[in-house]
């Protein structure tokens, strides 16, 4: 395909136009008085949202240079959303301000590389101040306040705080659509996976159709079991210990399954057999997780362990196991705390190194099952449009609350950046164009507060000047128009959100400023219509039939 190339100022201005179109659409949503944006969908009802990344994803531009500029800013929003779950609009507003101020200096003859270095040093200094001023979250109320701001709903904030309190910061909180109106929280105790008993004969509670084993041994096998001879040695040892047995294997069939069922019916031996969760490498990993959690080992020929010779020392233990027809829950596995911690850190590093969203999600689920627990928030609404929007808000608020627990909180409302900047720039000693680069950051960090004030119908410059003179942590409550102690009023942002927004915006701004040429696909001319007369022009696309 033919390419078109733009150089120098033309290239940079083309990118900036794309950035501005996207940023102008996104920034109207910033702050408590921000507006919504309606997104048309090819199929189904339109989506109404005030989420920056959702709006950014929908914007496609015709001009090839503008399109590239918009795509670069989408990356800022997406990366901030992935890392922190919020701050996408703040990141976009910061990127726009940095690029605008930066290009003005490049056009005036400043060296782009020196500007970039100055921007990086200033951002590093501001980030250090943000982290130093962060306040650790200690109470459920503080988590609720943070989540409420992200979701724009106090009830959602309280529910997320409750969920985080129960599952811990490593736990997984998933959001599902509900057929009923309102919100509901469902908690899972212990490790749960989506495989139930192989046969209903294993049921111990006929009314609830579930098998409950107290203080059982757990046999974990990475292969099929069909021959009863393989099981005999283990079964005898477990029977002598007078404890029940949970068997997790690729499959259990034939006489091996029949023997377990007969012994259960006769009442001589209580056991339950379930299939291992997952497939392929994911199954191996999940079995290893279960083994570490319960203090057992995966019996597999790959590691030289055979079922026929397995002793009790290879079996896991738990306080309780509950098995239904669809899922198995292991409560309080007897695994070694250090080994579990090691496994958790291994999974965490896999999450950081993974490029796939799907893999990351699955790894996060495994991490939660080992380190915390799983909570499900079920959300309902009157219409499909409202339900989609509500579900998305809750998902963002969950990530926001987790970010707050992780690194702490700072004053919200765009104030933390301005106040951290005041301290950072007082100690920053730079010269020449690097100092100019730092000044670009000094100007740009006012942008989020200015936009919040503008969206609230206030004069941005006046608000920023007023905030500069206030004590640390004090600023504008845009919802009421009053100047208050923001942290005390529950108006806060996770420092991870503010930090990520600034760092990601600066990263893209540096790319804009140091761009000297843009190569884009040449737009194709529209193919001529294939219809006949004027009145049939709309049928041109039917020519292929």
UniProtKB/Swiss-Prot annotation:
Function: Together with its co-chaperonin GroES, plays an essential role in assisting protein folding. The GroEL-GroES system forms a nano-cage that allows encapsulation of the non-native substrate proteins and provides a physical environment optimized to promote and accelerate protein folding.
Species: Arthrobacter sp. (strain FB24)
Binding partners and assembly: Forms a cylinder of 14 subunits composed of two heptameric rings stacked back-to-back. Interacts with the co-chaperonin GroES.
Sequence positions that bind ATP: 29-32, 86-90, 413, 477-479, 493
Protein name (database record): Chaperonin GroEL 1
Entry keyword set: ATP-binding, Chaperone, Cytoplasm, Isomerase, Nucleotide-binding
Record GO terms (molecular function): ATP binding; ATP-dependent protein folding chaperone; isomerase activity; unfolded protein binding
A Gene Ontology BP annotation from the UniProt entry: protein refolding
GO cellular component terms, A-Z: cytoplasm
Major enzyme class: isomerase
NCBIfam families tied to this protein: GroEL (TIGR02348), PRK00013.1 (NF000592), PRK12849.1 (NF009487), PRK12850.1 (NF009488), PRK12851.1 (NF009489)
EC number: 5.6.1.7
Record bears the keyword RNA-binding: no
């Amino acid at each position: 395909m033919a390419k078109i190339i733009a150089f120098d100022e033309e290239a940079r201005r083309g990118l900036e136009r794309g950035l501005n179109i996207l940023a102008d659409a996104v920034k109207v949503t910033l702050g408590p008085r921000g507006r919504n944006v309606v997104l048309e969908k090819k199929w189904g009802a339109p989506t109404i949202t005030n989420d920056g990344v959702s709006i950014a994803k929908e914007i496609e531009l015709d001009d090839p240079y503008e399109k590239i500029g918009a795509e670069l800013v989408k990356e800022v929003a997406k990366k901030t959303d992935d890392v922190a779950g919020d701050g996408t609009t703040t990141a976009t507003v910061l990127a726009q301000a940095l690029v605008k101020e930066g290009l003005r200096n490049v056009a005036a003859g400043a060296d782009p590389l020196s500007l970039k270095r100055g921007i990086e040093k200033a951002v590093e200094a501001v980030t250090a101040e943000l982290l130093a001023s962060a306040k650790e979250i200690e109470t459920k109320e503080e988590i609720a306040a943070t989540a409420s701001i992200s979701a724009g709903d106090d009830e959602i904030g309280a529910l997320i705080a409750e969920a985080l309190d129960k599952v811990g910061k490593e736990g997984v909180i998933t959001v599902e659509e509900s057929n009923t109106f309102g919100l509901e929280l469902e908690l899972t105790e212990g490790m749960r996976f989506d495989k139930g008993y192989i046969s209903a004969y294993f049921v111990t509670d006929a009314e609830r159709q579930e098998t409950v084993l107290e203080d059982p041994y757990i046999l974990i096998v990475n292969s099929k079991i069909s021959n009863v001879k393989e099981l005999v040695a283990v079964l005898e040892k477990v029977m002598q210990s007078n404890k029940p047995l949970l068997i997790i294997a690729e499959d259990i069939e034939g006489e091996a399954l029949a023997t377990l069922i007969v012994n259960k019916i006769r009442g001589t031996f209580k056991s339950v057999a379930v299939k291992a969760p997952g497939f392929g490498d994911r199954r191996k990993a999940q079995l290893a997780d279960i083994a570490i959690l319960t203090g057992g080992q995966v019996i597999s020929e790959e590691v030289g362990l055979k079922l026929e010779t397995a002793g009790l020392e290879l079996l896991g233990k738990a306080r309780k196991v509950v098995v239904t027809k669809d899922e198995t829950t292991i409560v309080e596995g007897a695994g070694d705390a250090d080994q579990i911690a090691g496994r958790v850190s291994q999974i965490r590093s896999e999450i950081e190194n993974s490029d796939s969203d799907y893999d990351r999600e699955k790894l996060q689920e495994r991490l939660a099952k080992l380190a915390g627990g799983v909570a499900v928030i079920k959300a309902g609404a009157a219409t499909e449009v409202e339900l989609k929007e509500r579900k998305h808000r809750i998902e963002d608020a969950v990530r926001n609350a987790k970010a707050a627990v992780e690194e702490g909180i700072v004053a919200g409302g765009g104030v933390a950046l301005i106040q951290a900047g005041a301290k950072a720039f007082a100690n920053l000693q730079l010269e020449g164009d690097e100092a100019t680069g730092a000044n670009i950051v000094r100007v740009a960090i006012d942008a989020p507060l200015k936009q919040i004030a503008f969206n609230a119908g206030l004069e941005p410059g006046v608000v920023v000047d007023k905030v500069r003179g206030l004590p640390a942590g004090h600023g504008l409550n845009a919802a009421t128009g009053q100047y208050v102690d923001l942290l005390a009023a529950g108006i806060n942002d996770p420092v991870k959100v503010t930090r990520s927004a600034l760092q990601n915006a600066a990263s893209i701004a540096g790319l804009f400023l140091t761009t000297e040429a843009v190569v884009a696909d040449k737009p194709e001319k529209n193919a001529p219509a294939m219809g006949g007369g004027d009145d049939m022009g709309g049928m041109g696309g039917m020519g292929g039939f």
